[in-house]
Regions:
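Walker A (P-loop) phosphate-binding loop of ABC-type ATPase nucleotide-binding domains
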Residues: 35-39
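Conserved ABC transporter NBD signature motif
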Residues: 56-67, 72-75
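Conserved ABC ATPase "signature" region
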Residues: 96, 100, 107-125
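Conserved ABC ATPase signature
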Residues: 129-133
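Hydrophobic anchor residue at the start of the ABC signature
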Residues: 143
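A short, proline-enriched helix->beta-strand linker immediately N-terminal to the Walker B motif
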Residues: 148-152
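Catalytic Walker B motif of ABC-type/P-loop ATPase nucleotide-binding domains
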Residues: 154-158
Length: 167
């Protein structure tokens, strides 16, 4: 599913990630652990195609993240550390918009949105404007977005940030 070979990222003279190599197979659950500044978020951003590596290669479902980023992204859902949301949309409007961007067919959009709204506990806020949501609910909207389309791979950066324990 994911194959990284000697993945590195430099910012000027600072080396954020140095020669990271690993494989993650379908069905595996993996976490990156390390102190602040260890390169965890940078590695995730490279894997998702949001930040090009300085050197090395990585593939998702066999697609190179640099040469075929759109094909690679079709196989993943990504929840970044800081969730970029459109504050001037209602929760379900935003999720329908994101579903269209992900290529979900018109007749499947509402069932897909309904499913992730339920999975992420968003029903109480589904009609609210995103700008009015708490940090925890904003995080849930980001997770719902990542789950849209039932991706083969889910990449979560600080997924519990702002979430309250349920019961």
């Amino acid at each position: 599913m994911i194959h990284a070979d000697q993945l590195s990222k430099e910012f000027g003279r600072f080396q954020a990630v140095k020669n990271a190599s690993f494989q993650i197979e379908k069905g595996e659950i993996v976490g990156f652990l390390g102190p602040n500044g260890a390169g965890k978020t940078t590695t995730l951003r490279m894997l998702t195609g949001y930040l090009p590596p300085t050197s090395g290669t990585a593939t998702i479902a066999g697609f190179d993240i640099v040469k075929n980023p759109l094909e690679a992204r079709k196989h993943l859902g990504y929840l970044p550390e800081h969730v970029p949301l459109y504050d001037d949309q209602r929760v379900t409007e935003y999720l329908k918009f994101r579903a269209r961007l992900k290529g979900i067919s018109s007749r499947q959009i509402w069932p897909a949105v309904s499913k992730v709204v339920e999975q992420c506990g968003l029903d109480p806020v589904r009609r609210k404007m995103i700008r009015t949501l708490s940090k925890g609910y904003r995080q849930r909207v980001g997770l719902a977005d990542a789950l849209l389309g039932e991706p083969d791979l889910l990449i979560l950066d600080e997924p519990t940030n702002g979430l309250c324990l349920l019961y």
